[in-house]
Amino acid sequence: MTATITLSTGQRMPTVGLGTWKSAPGQVKQAVLAALDCGYRHIDCAAAYSNEREVGEALTERLGPGKSLRRDDIFVTSKLWNTKHHPDDVEEACRRSLSDLRLSYLDLYLIHWPMAFGRGDELIPRHPDGTIQYDDTHYRDTWAAMEKLVDQGLAKAIGLSNFNAKQIDDILSIAKHKPVVNQVECHPYLVQAELVSHCWSRNLTVTAYSPLGSPDRPWVTPGEALLLDDPRVVGIAKSYNKTPAQVIIRWHIQRGVVCIPKSVTPSRIKQNIEVFDFKLSDEDMRLIESFNRNERFIIPTVIKDGQKIWRDAKHPHFPFIEPY
C-alpha cells in the first residue's frame, strides 16, 4: 500500500500516483488496470490528455460492488483545460470529465494552466495565421466557478497547476474554498525549492508532474540531457540496488512532494511504486537537490526565425516570467 499525505481538506492523497499524460489510446486502459492491480490508489488525469474515456473503462472494471476496489479507495484528479476557463463553461467541462471517467465526483479538480484560450472544443484554437487564440477570462473568475463544483459535490477539492507564487497568492486573496494543491513540473534538474516552500507556507501540497524529467516529451531535441541517464543518478541508484527512476521518485516523496510518474509498461509501473522499502540518506537527498539547474522541460515551444521560443510567453497570465 502506498503512503499518503494529508491535504488541507483532511483528504488523504497517495504520494505516488499514475500519470496519464502522453499515454496513447489503446495503452492507457491497460496501464491503469496494471497500476490498480499492483497497489496504486491515485490516478492523475486531464481532459487535455484526450484519454479520460479509456481511463474510465479501466476504473469501471475495478471499482464498485463485487469488484476489487471501492470508489473511496482511490484518489482521482482531473484538470480544467484552457479553453474552458469562462465561468459558464467550467461545470460542463467538469461533468464531461466525470462522464468520461464514469465517476460521480472527483477527489481533486485543478485549473490546468492560469492562461485562458479561446472558448470552444478545439484543444488549441488558432487564428487564421496559425497563432493561438487567447481569451481574457481571468483565472480569478474561473476559480469562483470552480468553487461551485465543491458546493455541488462534483469535486471534493480544487487546486491549481502551473501557477506561480504571485498567482497562487492572487487566488488565495479571493478564495472561499482554498486551493489544496499546486501541480507543477518538478525533478532534480528543476527542484523548485522556492515555489515548494511558498506552497507549503500557504498550506498547499505540491504534486510533481514529469517527476523523472519526461524523457518522452513531445518537443525533446537531440542531445538534450536525460535525467535518468545522468551518471550521478545512476551511481546513487546502484548504491541502493534500485533503478534511477526509483531513486528520483523516492527523493520526491521523502522531501514531501507527491509525484505522478507516467508509464504504460506494466513492469515499470510496478517498479515506480516499489519505493517504500528504502530511504535515501540526508547526504544523498542534498546531493540530488544540488543537481538543480532550473531547467524546465515542459513548456510548449515554437520555432521562430530559427530560434526555439516559448509558445505562450505573450499571454498576460503566462506563469514562467516570474522567478518562481
From Swiss-Prot:
**A molecular function GO annotation:** S-nitrosoglutathione reductase (NADPH) activity
**Cellular localization per UniProt:** Cytoplasm, Cytosol; Apical cell membrane
| Reaction(s) catalysed (UniProt annotation) | a primary alcohol + NADP(+) = an aldehyde + NADPH + H(+); S-nitroso-CoA + NADPH + H(+) = sulfinamide-CoA + NADP(+); S-nitrosoglutathione + NADPH + H(+) = S-(hydroxysulfenamide)glutathione + NADP(+)
Active site per the UniProt annotation: 49
What biological-process GO terms show up in the record? aldehyde catabolic process; cellular detoxification of aldehyde; glucose homeostasis; sprouting angiogenesis
What SUPFAM superfamilies has UniProt attached to this entry?
NAD(P)-linked oxidoreductase (SSF51430)
| UniProt entry keywords in alphabetical sequence | Cell membrane, Cytoplasm, Membrane, NADP, Oxidoreductase
Q: Which Pfam families match?
A: Aldo_ket_red
> What's an example GO cellular component term for this entry?
apical plasma membrane
EC number(s) reported in the record: 1.1.1.2, 1.6.-.-
Q: Where is this site: Lowers pKa of active site Tyr?
A: 79
The protein's superkingdom reads Eukaryota
Q: What class of enzyme is it?
A: oxidoreductase
Q: Where does NADP(+) bind?
A: 10-21, 44, 161-162, 210, 212, 214, 262-265, 268, 271-272
Output the CDD domains linked to this UniProt entry.
AKR_AKR1A1-4 (cd19106)
Question: Has UniProt tagged this entry with the keyword Zinc-finger?
Answer: no
Q: Which family does it belong to?
A: Belongs to the aldo/keto reductase family.
Main role? Catalyzes the NADPH-dependent reduction of a wide variety of carbonyl-containing compounds to their corresponding alcohols. Displays enzymatic activity towards endogenous metabolites such as aromatic and aliphatic aldehydes, ketones, monosaccharides and bile acids. Acts as an aldehyde-detoxification enzyme. Also acts as an inhibitor of protein S-nitrosylation by mediating degradation of S-nitroso-coenzyme A (S-nitroso-CoA), a cofactor required to S-nitrosylate proteins. Also acts as a S-nitroso-glutathione reductase by catalyzing the NADPH-dependent reduction of S-nitrosoglutathione.
Could you tell me what this protein is called? Aldo-keto reductase family 1 member A1-A
Organism, as annotated: Danio rerio
Q: Which gene encodes it?
A: akr1a1a
